[in-house]
Structures are given as C-alpha cells and as structure tokens.
Amino acid sequence: PLNRDMSHPESRKITSMLLGGALADSLRGKTIDRICNQNDWPAMLLSQLNLPTTKFSWSKNILDPAAVEFAYYSNENCLGWITPHKNYVYSYASGTIEELKGIQDSTGSQTAAIQAKAYLQTLYQTYLGY
C-alpha cells in the first residue's frame, strides 16, 4: 500500500473492526491499539465467548493486558519481528538485522533475532508434524 516496501512493518498494518454480540459491552466503541497477528484472533474471539482456546496454541488474547505484544511476518526477502518498542527486519540476502524503530541497541537486536528464529523454528517444526 502507498508504494511501501513490503519488507517493512508499516506495510503490514491493518485496521480491523469487531462487530456483533460476542464483544463485551465494556469494549464496545473502544480503540484497541495492540500489536498482534491474524492468528491471535481465535483466542481473542473465543475468550469473548467464554470458550476454550487450547486448540489455538499459536493464538493469544490481545484483549488480555497480560498478553505479550509482538507480531511476526516473513516473505521471500525477509523476516520481520515487531514489538511495542522496536521493529526489526532480518534480510535473508545480506544476513543483517535492521532496526526500524527504537533506540539502536545491538543486544536488543540479538535478543530479537533469537526470539524470531525460535518462533520460526517452532512454527516450522509444528508444520512438519501435520
């Protein structure tokens, strides 16, 4: 969108609206500005309906203030890791990590790289198990 580089997190922002009776009255008309992935929707919606979320191990209830905010994305060129404090993009071609938001911090970059790699490895291993 808007000629943005699809490797950058700004190209991944999507505005969503929740409508209907499942949403708690206390949340109606509210803006929820939390970082999440589309796979977080099942846990969020099922929690609103007081239904179990255990079958959706990759999902988190973003309406729960204790839920850790992060988003992951990948394409043929990169792996992106988005947190409230920093956004990182790992380039497959160059093998480098680019910090796109936040204070430059090599320790933070390495921690984010480890988290993103662990997430991707676990995701891939789960996929292979199907």
Label every model-predicted segment:
Residues P1-Y130:
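Solvent-exposed soluble domains appended to multi-pass membrane proteins
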